[in-house]
Amino acid sequence: MTAADHQHGTAHGHERFQGVSGLACGATMLVGRGSLSRLVASLAGVGPGDRVLDVGCGPGGAAREAARRGATVTGVDPAPVMLRLGRYLSASGSGRNIVFVEGVAEALPVADRAVTVAWAISSVHHWTDVPAGLRELHRVLAPGGRLVIAERLSRPGARGLAAHGLTEAQAAETAAAAQAAGFAGAGHETHRAGRRTLAVVRAHRAADGPG
């Protein structure tokens, strides 16, 4: 499954995540996202000693939630303006346990088996190659590591901003792609976070898995 398989036809580019408009987008991402970050961290079972990878971290709200729970965190995002904002907002307290790195899901700047938890929140619909991104996530997760993907639940046929997410069918396709990428126990479900209904995909790397 590539971005072309999404109902809106193509991956959403990152052009708007630049300059002043990028800062504005980053600020918008911080509004009302606390419940989403807490939900994903809870679904992933994040706790002290975990090494968390946040793919498409934006300004780092979910990364800071993981750090508050005692994890060390690597936030990866292709937009330099998001990384700068994330570093600024994470400069004190537990935020000092977060490292922000420029990169994309399809070529993660992370070593093999380096993390115990990986998640992608509202970012998979931006990926240019979903199977490649999932293979990369499998590569960087340690055996037994947990994966959570969370996207807004979209309606079939939605257009514009309403299509920024996954339909139930696309969530099922993403779970199947995760299984094909080597993950075990891949499945999809819906959750509520504040006013949002989310399509969530969860899986794990088998404790004795190859690769």
Residue ranges and their predicted role:
Residues 4-33, 146-202:
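C-terminal alpha-helical "lid/dimerization" subdomain adjacent to the S-adenosyl-L-methionine
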Residues 30-50:
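Conserved alpha-helix/loop element of class I SAM-dependent methyltransferases that forms part
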Residues 51, 145-146:
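Short glycine-centered segments of the SAM/dcSAM-binding site in methyltransferase folds
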Residues 51-107:
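Class I SAM-dependent methyltransferase SAM/SAH-binding core
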Residues 106-117:
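A short acidic, Gly/Pro-enriched loop at the edge of an enzyme's catalytic core
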Residues 117-130:
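A short SAM/SAH-binding and catalytic strip from SAM-dependent methyltransferases
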Residues 131-143:
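A short glycine-rich, Lys/Arg-flanked "PGG" loop and its adjoining helix->strand segment in the class I
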Residues 202-211:
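C-terminal lobe and adjacent flexible extensions of AdoMet/dcAdoMet transferase-like proteins
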